[in-house]
Regions:
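Short, hydrophobic-biased segments on the C-terminal half of alpha helices
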Residues: 65, 83-84
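N-terminal positioning helix adjacent to the helix-turn-helix/winged-helix DNA-binding module
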Residues: 15, 47-49, 111, 139
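N-terminal helix-turn-helix DNA-binding core of bacterial DNA-binding proteins
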Residues: 32-75
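N-terminal leader segment of winged-helix/HTH proteins
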Residues: 1-42, 89
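Charged, amphipathic alpha-helical coiled-coil/dimerization segments
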Residues: 2-7, 84-141
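C-terminal regulatory/oligomerization modules of transcriptional regulators
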Residues: 1-14, 137-158
Length: 158
């Protein structure tokens, strides 16, 4: 990465380090592009979009808070803070789990579903421009296979 010292990658070959930093830079760039356009066009941060999308794909469009945090790849505290903002804006609603009153569910509201549908067009457009337009179907198959292997090899996989 920019400004990295030689000591930061003493255990990696230059090509290994370059591959790693290229992946990080691509990820950061695409997320920044998504975040900027989602905020400008829909008033949603990319993390908010991700939570709405995660809820939309869940059974009954609702999840417990810990499941939502896990699936959205957020910390529990970050999820609580984000859900509070989304609830204030009427995009989600929280309710107590009737089976265990210590737990909470978060559900996508109709307003949240409409906001998500509108934002999905922007999300798709950015991904088309920054990823799909510059990769072939064969490239994407290869990347998908590679990412699956990397995910399975990760200690936190599963």
């Amino acid at each position: 990465m920019e400004g990295s010292s030689a000591g930061q990658n003493d255990f990696l070959e230059p090509g290994e380090w370059a591959a790693w930093t290229a992946l990080l830079m691509l990820h950061r760039t695409v997320l920044q592009d998504l975040d900027a356009e989602l905020r400008r066009e829909h008033g949603l941060a990319v993390t908010e979009y991700n939570v709405l999308s995660t809820l939309s794909n869940a059974p009954g469009k609702q999840l417990g808070m810990s499941a939502l945090a896990h699936r959205a790849m957020l910390s529990p505290a970050g999820t609580t803070h984000l859900v509070t903002r989304l609830e204030r804006d009427g995009l989600v609603k929280r309710s107590v789990d009737p089976a265990d009153r210590r737990k909470w569910f978060t559900a996508l509201t109709e307003k949240g579903d409409k906001a998500l549908q509108a934002a999905r067009r922007t999300h798709s457009r950015v991904l088309q421009r920054s990823f799909l337009a510059v990769t072939s179907p064969a490239d994407r198959r290869l990347l998908r296979q590679l990412w699956q292997r990397l995910s399975q090899a990760s200690p936190g996989a599963g």
